[in-house]
Every structure is written in structure tokens, then in C-alpha cells.
Amino acid sequence: MRIRSIQYLRAVAALLVVVAHALLHPLNYMDPTYARLGDYGVLLFFVISGFIMVFTTGRGTFPPRDFLYRRIERIVPLYWLVTIGVSILAVYAPFLLKNTRFTWGQLVQSLLFIPFYRENGDLVPLMKLGWSLNYEMFFYCLFAAMALLRATTRVLLLTCLFLLLTLIGALIDFQAAIPRFYTAHVVLTFCVGMGIALLYQRRSDLIRGPLMTALWAILGIMFTLLGFAQPHDVPITIWVEIPLTLASASFLLLGLNIERRLPNSRIGIALGDASYAMYLTHMYFVAAIIVVLHKLTGELLPLLVTLASIALSVLGALFVHRYIERPITRWLRRNLAPAKRSEPVAQPVSG
């Protein structure tokens, strides 16, 4: 079962990240408002991911092997291709990248979703946006480890585990990359999505009726404004992530509430399908636009760079999804899939 509102929200999340980088990349400084746009998109992806994992696996148990295979076949191939592409650029065209420097050790860690520090202190892989996929894979592995539990028990245990990790991270200032990364409070966003999925499975009154439609719309707007109203000297921390996560949850609940009244937009569905490709590949297109426009005009006009980057990123993602991502996924399902399969698990939502 495909939920249209989820597809549309996935498209919105990817576009938020694209717009943020299209605005940021030409600048020589970090604009906090633009950066928060990108973080908003990722937080929305994480909330959707938590929802999708619970929704697609149902109320009971599920085969963990099939679940993990489907997660790997959808996430790994394109991410590996993009990571290898970034590595090639770092070696042969480093001027296209701001802070990325290639080492074999970092390539291996990136491909295996192992967090590490870069030379500049950033806790991100070679393909910077892969940090979110490190969290996704961590979530998937823990979710699969509880496959033999019923959905409610699974969600409660995972929520307790993530709360414990967050508490440990708050009490201990880890310096090592792995414990510092996985005890960050951002992991709690998955719990928000999982909780909404439980409500949806039980046909909760929170997900029906005109009153709830108005409530979730108002809360979504209010929390969004609150997240962006934080002073610019406040970094992307819990004080920004809390309202933006609540805004993401509100818009997810709004979408589920009006699902039957939503138009069946082919463009919206297509962009939702291509959202993972858009998330992973858009920086290639943004960099290409900047290089081409700089050579053609001798200067970078911010508005032109932004609009051209967004347009090319969307078109490029649709192309990559149709002619690279989907064929690879089909081939893997035909040739390497486990003999016995569970119900299909939806596409990755964080990329």
C-alpha cells in the first residue's frame, strides 16, 4: 500500500535539502537560516523513516533477514556509487569540493557506514550527506534485532534504548567518533515516526476529522516558525531540532489525516520515488552549475545559481532514479534476493 502523503513529504524533504545547498554552496560562509532548511529536510526524512518501518512491517513479527536485505538493496548501491564518485573527484578535481580529502581508510569506513572524524574535525563520511545514512543503518539494524517482537513492544523498547543512548551522550562527553555519533539526540526523531505509525495502525482519532486537520496544520506552521525563530548564534542543536521535529510530525499527521482528499499527483509521486536519488546526487549538480556559470559569466549570481541548481538537481534525480537506481534494484531482486521474502518494505526515506 502506497501512502500518497508520505510520497509528497519525501519529495518535500529532499527539496528542502536541495534548496539549502543551492543557497549555501555559492557562499563563503555558513548562513544559519539556509542550514536549518537542510536540517529540517533531514529531520523530516527521519520521522518518515520511523513511520515507514513500523507501518510496512505490520503489528506482528517479521523475517529480519528479508527486512535487512531490502534495506541494503535500496540504500547501499546508489550510496556506494556516489561515494566512489566523490572519491574520484577528491583525487582528480578537488577544486569542486570544499573540504573533502581522499584517503583509503576513510573510503572503507564510509562504505561500511562507520562514523569517523575528518581532518577538519567534522563527523561525516566522504560523501558528507552520508552521515544521515549512518543513522538510518543503525536504526535498521536495531529494528531488525527486535523483529521477533510485536510492533508495540518493539517500538517501546527501541524508544527506551534511544532515550538511554541520548542520556548517556548528555552525561558523557565522548570524544571517540562512534559513541559520540550514536549517542546524539537526533536518534529520537525515529521514535516520533514510530509512535505516529502505531497511532495510524490503531486508527486513532488523532488522525481523522476536520478539527485534527486544522490542529496539525496550525502546529506544523507554528513549530516551523519556532525552529527558524531561534537566534542565529544558536547552532543546529536540540533547541532547533525539537521544534523542527515536532513540525515534521505535525505535517506527517496532517498528511495522514487528509490522505483520501489529496490529489493523485504524478509529479509528486515521481519526486517522492526519486527523493533518495535527489538527496544523494544533488551536490554533483549544484557543483556543476557553479562551475559552468562561473565560466560563462565570470561571476556567480546567487539567484541564477540557486534556481539552476534546483532545476538540474530535480531533473538529474529523476534520470538517476529511472536509469540507474531502479535497474540496479531490479537486478538485485532478481539475482540476489533471499529465496523466501516478506511483504515489500518501502523505499528508504532519508535518503
Report the location of each language-model feature:
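Active-site helix-to-loop segments that bind/position phosphate- or nucleotide-bearing substrates
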Residues: I72
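Alpha-helical transmembrane segments in multi-pass integral membrane proteins
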Residues: M1-Y8, V12-R36, V54-D66, F116-D122, ...
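Long, low-complexity, intrinsically disordered cytosolic termini of multi-pass membrane proteins
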Residues: V349-G351
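Alpha-helical scaffold elements that line and support the substrate/ligand-binding pocket
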Residues: G50, Y140-A147
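Membrane-interface helix-loop-helix regions
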Residues: Y40, V54, I75-M137, C141, ...
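Residues within membrane-spanning alpha-helices of integral membrane proteins
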Residues: Q7, A11-A14, V42-L43, S49, ...
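Phosphate-coordinating loops and pocket residues in cytosolic domains that bind phosphorylated ligands
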Residues: Y69
